[in-house]
Amino acid sequence: GTMQEVQQTAKQLGVAVEVEGYLPRDTAAEELTVAAAKECVTNCIKHADGNEVYIRIAERNHCHDITITNNGRVPTGPIREGSGLSALRHSIESYGGEMHISHEPRFALLITIPAKENEL
């Protein structure tokens, strides 16, 4: 799917998805970003009871740096990775990227995906 589709679906569920920065032009990197966005929308609704998801995409050191947060309830402790997040981590790591989850001061999904040379 595309980021537009994620935004439309989220909107129907009452969640606004704000994207700052540009999606990676590389298909695989873009798909991973979209998958992460989708997962975060689901988690925002299911666990955090939030209605806004923020996605920040930046380019740094030949990598796409993606940070996803929401305005929902702050987690009370470390996030347990459910099947959605571990599947996402698996996809990102098999592409050579990294995924970190922080829960302080609020939930954040931090993803680094290597950029292909022709994208830079």
Q: Which role does the model predict for each range below?
A:
Residues C63, R73-V74, E104-L110:
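Glycine-rich nucleotide-binding loop
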Residues G77-P105:
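ATP phosphate-binding glycine-rich loop and adjacent ATP-lid/helix-beta elements
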